[in-house]
């Protein structure tokens, strides 16, 4: 078992979102290590202003060359893009490091046409901004049938949960990338791995979303 599977304690972003979830729900947060992240109602309410109409098939928004570990974990992304992305797809690399080396791949590549600053800076100085809701980022996922969810600086993907709450189907390199501990990995979400046949399943989307609301929110436990 890799070291990340014993890393039960939540990182900064998940910790802050979980604290907000308990506070907004008026529920006392349990004492001790929390290993399943929660999203607060105020965060989930942002989706009310976003369309879930599927205008894209595949999408990926993020960084690749920002850090050696991330570059290694995401080395499969560009080959996948070149093989599977279509005129309906959406790609955007959003770090200065990517802009320096990337060459536009196709009409679906919006890397050089989008000027907004990337979500995470080179030195991972996250701060509270990392807990903010990026409407453009989530909007693309909400309008996509599938979202690429590569590992980041650790062998798991926060994007996996973001994809599910956006009602898109995750595509992972490996099974264990769906969570940084066994409890998360065994929740039971449905997703595709590299090499699968990527068939859009509305029943998967509905199942995953309902499971997410039950497992990762306190929307049904408010005072």
Residue map of PLM features:
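Nucleotide-sugar donor-binding catalytic core of glycosyltransferases
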Residues: 1-161, 165-189, 211-222
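C-terminal "capping" alpha-helix adjacent to the active site of nucleotide-linked donor transferases
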Residues: 187-212
């Amino acid at each position: 078992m890799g070291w990340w599977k014993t890393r039960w304690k939540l990182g900064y972003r998940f910790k802050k979102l979980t604290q907000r979830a308990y506070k907004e729900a008026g529920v006392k947060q349990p004492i001790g290590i929390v290993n399943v992240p929660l999203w607060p109602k105020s965060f989930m309410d942002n989706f009310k202003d976003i369309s879930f109409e599927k205008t894209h098939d595949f999408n990926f928004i993020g960084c690749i060359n920002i850090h050696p570990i991330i570059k290694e974990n995401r080395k499969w992304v560009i080959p996948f893009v070149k093989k599977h992305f279509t005129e309906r797809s959406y790609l955007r690399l959003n770090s200065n490091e990517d802009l320096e080396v990337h060459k536009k791949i196709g009409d679906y590549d919006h890397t050089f046409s989008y000027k907004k600053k990337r979500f995470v800076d080179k030195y991972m100085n996250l701060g509270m901004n990392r807990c903010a809701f990026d409407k453009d980022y989530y909007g693309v996922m909400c309008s996509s049938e599938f979202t690429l969810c590569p590992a980041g600086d650790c062998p798991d993907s926060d994007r996996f949960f973001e994809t599910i709450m956006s009602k898109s189907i995750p595509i992972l390199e490996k099974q264990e990338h769906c969570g940084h501990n066994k409890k998360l990995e065994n929740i039971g979400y449905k997703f595709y791995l590299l090499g699968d046949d990527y068939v859009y399943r509305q029943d998967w989307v509905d199942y995953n979303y309902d499971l997410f609301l039950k497992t990762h929110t306190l929307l049904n436990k408010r005072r």
